[in-house]
Regions:
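Bacterial N-terminal signal peptides that target proteins for export
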Residues: 9-18
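Intrinsic-disorder/low-complexity regions
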Residues: 5, 75-76, 491
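Bacterial N-terminal signal peptides
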Residues: 18-26
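Acidic, metal/ion-coordinating pockets
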Residues: 30-313, 353-365, 375, 425, ...
Length: 571
């Protein structure tokens, strides 16, 4: 079954009939189906080997599963692509990014071994910094793509705009784009010398160039979500905007938004375009079958078809696992290192309803490192836990998922208030009585809350739910958005003044405009650099690790001084 049209169907059944046939052929040793198979991974976030190095447990989905498919089909009979965000998200890649920089990086090592043909850069790849992604680029035996990441000095793409691949008698062009929103999240130091241009205009610029190559197929490899029809190409997720408004693409592989989706659309020239979106962390493999063509004329084999393959339906390659067994053991040893001890178990779940030991530990570390007056921090995961007992390196990836830097910025008291109003507007509903929802969930057209994997789905990402430490305040959820927060004083009891200036500790994502908090506070993106007092040289997780090493023993408890009112509605 090939799924088109209704994206909801992909949640019910994402394995296609063609995949079922392919698996039968793998078992029987028969020849693979006619046509060219294109496979694409996206948003792997370090899930290269069958082991979750943060949880310390084996997993049934990784590139070990893909390795068995490559061996069966053969690299000459397939095009293999990656759609970015591979360099961040697991201790495995962190180790090779920053701890062991002398050996070949694990990402090009594995992708070269699997005969990848091309990859597009993602925003989390850029977040590792020039030293890392430039090194990875040098070590890859295939091109890294991003036509809209432009070298400021030359005016040409910093990475390759596209690549030409010839397989099974077909000439395939793969064109890469990265989400243009990178500057909204990352400090300029991480992409110095690069500007990010909007996607539709960039695709229009390069389409005539690519068509002069007389390809049989043009494939988009976009590290950007599908998005909406009304987006213009400068939005975070603009793949659909390109598909609809830039004729010439046959297939577009999407990513970044971690959604699973397949849909066929008709562009403004009346041509069909297939879009696939492939989730994250090697859960699924995007797949398109290209019928044999000559000069872009479809043969009698039919139209391009697509599917999402559940990665764990492919058997893992034992040869692949054995090849990288030393790497697996190295990372196990690295993540098992004891750095201290916690005298309490803490969870992010508490943080959604008031002060929590988990988030307040982040607050305390940020305030201690920065010396700031106030700290802003959020629960980066919905349901994360650090248990009482020995603290290991892997626990630091639970405490802080992202490789953000720590910034100290200047804000007035009024701006602090508006910042918090925005945060709690993302976070809490306006309640009329104690039976109303406190948290802002997503609701369907029938007014029922949306459930995903048995869990209510929040309207906004929890990493945007910033609370504050260093001040005493309440959040009145009976009042409308924008007028809920009342700041009584600083934590030491001294007055808090709207017109006074305070030093505030925030992560680099927030300090560069992520989440819209600073914009809501009245601080535009262009104003942000002038507000920066200082920034760390390394990621915040590194400093948290060293802070705990120095302390040796910690007792994380709720320490921030804020509460939700009316109390009898929320208790």
């Amino acid at each position: 079954m090939v799924i088109f049209g209704d994206p909801k169907k992909v949640q019910m059944k994402i394995r296609s009939l063609s995949v079922f046939i392919l698996l039968l052929l793998m078992l029987s040793g028969c020849k693979e189906p006619e046509g060219l198979e294109i496979y694409a991974t996206t948003d792997l976030h370090g899930m290269l080997l069958p082991f979750d190095n943060t949880e310390g447990t084996a997993t049934d989905h990784s590139l070990a599963n893909l390795a068995s498919l490559v061996k069966t089909v053969g690299s000459d009979n397939m095009v293999l692509l990656d759609n970015g965000d591979i360099l961040q998200g697991d201790p495995l890649t962190y180790y090779y990014n920053f701890e062991d920089t002398t050996r070949e990086h694990i990402v090009p090592d594995i992708l070269n071994h699997l005969h990848y043909d091309a990859a597009t850069e993602g925003n989390h790849d850029i977040e590792t910094g020039h030293a890392v992604y430039d090194r990875v680029r040098r070590e890859c035996s295939f091109p890294l793509l991003a036509a809209n990441a432009v070298d400021i000095q030359t005016g040409k793409p910093y990475f390759e705009p596209y690549t030409v691949i010839r397989k099974k008698g077909l000439k395939i062009i793969v064109f890469g784009l990265i989400t243009p929103s990178v500057p909204n999240w990352l400090p300029e130091s991480l992409y110095h010398g690069i500007r990010f241009e909007e996607m539709v205009a960039t695709a229009r610029k390069w389409m005539p160039v690519m068509q002069k190559e007389n390809p049989d197929v043009i494939v988009g490899l976009f590290h950007s979500g599908i998005g909406n029809e009304d987006e213009k190409g400068d939005d975070e997720n603009s793949s659909l905007a390109v598909a609809l408004n830039v004729p010439g693409f046959d297939v577009i592989f999407c990513g970044h938004d971690h959604n699973k989706d397949i849909r066929e659309v008709v562009n403004n020239a009346g041509e069909k375009v297939l879009l696939l979106d492939g989730g994250s962390r090697a859960e699924v493999l995007m797949h398109a079958n290209i019928p044999l063509r000559t000069k872009r004329e479809v043969s009698g084999n039919g139209e391009i078809t697509g599917s999402l393959i559940e990665m764990n339906t492919l058997p893992p390659s034992q040869a692949f696992i054995e090849k990288y067994s030393d790497v697996t053991e190295t990372i196990r040893e690295y993540t098992s290192e004891i750095i201290g001890r916690s005298n309490a178990t803490v969870t992010t779940r508490d943080a959604f309803f008031g002060p929590s030991g988990f988030v307040d530990l982040i607050h305390c570390i940020q305030l201690d490192i920065s010396g700031a007056d106030i700290s802003f921090a959020a629960p980066l995961s919905f349901d994360e836990e650090i248990k009482e007992g020995d603290l290991r390196i892997r626990d630091m990836f639970r405490l802080y998922r992202f490789e953000n830097f720590l910034y100290t910025v200047k804000m007035t008291g009024a701006e602090v208030d508006r910042f918090l109003e925005h945060s709690y507007g993302l976070w809490f509903s306006t309640m009329k009585n104690r039976n109303d929802w406190l948290l802002r969930y997503r609701f369907n057209d029938s007014g029922e809350p949306v459930m995903v994997n048995g869990r209510l789905r929040l309207r906004s990402a929890s990493y945007n739910f910033d609370s504050a430490m260093g001040i005493r305040y309440t959040v009145d959820v009976s009042r409308p958005e924008g007028s809920r927060v009342t700041i009584m004083s600083m934590s030491d009891g001294t007055p808090f003044f709207p017109d006074s200036t305070y030093s505030v500790a925030v992560n680099s994502y927030r300090a560069n405009g992520g989440g819209g908090h600073f914009a809501a506070a009245g601080i535009t993106h262009s104003m942000l650099p002038s507000r920066v007092i200082s920034a760390t040289d390394r990621d915040l997780r590194y400093y948290m690790t060293e802070w705990i090493r120095k302390k040796g023993e910690i007792t994380p408890v709720p320490l921030s001084e804020w509460s939700v009112v009316p109390e009898h509605w929320v208790t």
